[in-house]
Amino acid sequence: MKELNSTPSKRDKKTFLIHQFLFVILLATSYPTSVFSQTYRKIAGWSDEVNNRIESFLNTTLTMNNRKVAVFDGDGTVIGQVPYYLADEALYRYADKNYKDRNDPQAKSKIAILNRMVKDGNNVGKVYVEDRVHFLAGMTPAEIMDMGYECYLDSYQGKFYPEMKQLIANLKEYGFEVWILTASPEFLYQKFLAEELGLPDTQILGVKSVVANGRLTDEIIMPIPQDDGKANVIPTFIKARPLIVGGNSRGDMDMLNQSCGLKIVVNPDDTTIRGKEDGPMNGYTVKQYWGKRGSGHREM
């Protein structure tokens, strides 16, 4: 038997080098294709100027290796809330069905909370926001999710802004983590927002409270995502500074200022002059305030 030579011939070496060279070329040419395959889809209803600016910004993020985060307010930013906030509508509906005709201590306590909220009237104030959670205390997370989902199906389906859904789809195409940050109870909003926007429910953040023995308690977990608390939620729970932040109201101002890239102001109010309690927005409407900030934001 002829002894096999374990040493490659010159021809074998040449073939091996060619194959190796081809492999390197294929690797080098296929890599950019995977990195730069994102395609921006124009958002109908927004101007060419706005679309071009968003696309240009997204293209600057293509080579980023760190987390790309976008944060949006919920009520009034991604979904319309007229004439009432879904968070309030859901509570009133539930009380009408389950507590109205009862005289036991639990029912009286829940109705008293709603009466206090009506008397307060400031549905973006922290006390009002906390009272929503107090109303839900004692229920299971699943019951609260279903309450919000049923109210959405009955009264708010079709009120998502299509432009915002298109924007979020573009962001996902470019590899962004999209988070929704709302001052409404977290469990109440998670199910329908996650389903409509195609996001994990863990990326829907709202007012949190401790769950003990499978039921919501009155113990609220700080920070409350309203006003300055919204800005504090970002480093506390998201743990990354966002490249894009979008909101629509005074309560979103602090959160918007956390963006290190685009600030998107959706349907800003141009009627109510803000007071001293609104800090730097004092003397301006929401639209006027962001207008004077110059090109650091984009109004939709």
Predicted ranges, named:
Residues 75-77, 83-84, 209, 268-269:
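Solvent-exposed coil/turn segments that connect beta secondary-structure elements
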Residues 81-84, 90-91, 191-192, 258:
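Short, solvent-exposed loop/turn and secondary-structure capping segments
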Residues 83-158, 162, 166:
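A metal-dependent, Asp-based hydrolase signature
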Residues 38-49, 53-55, 59-69, 141-179, ...:
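C-terminal cap/substrate-recognition subdomain and adjoining C-terminal extension
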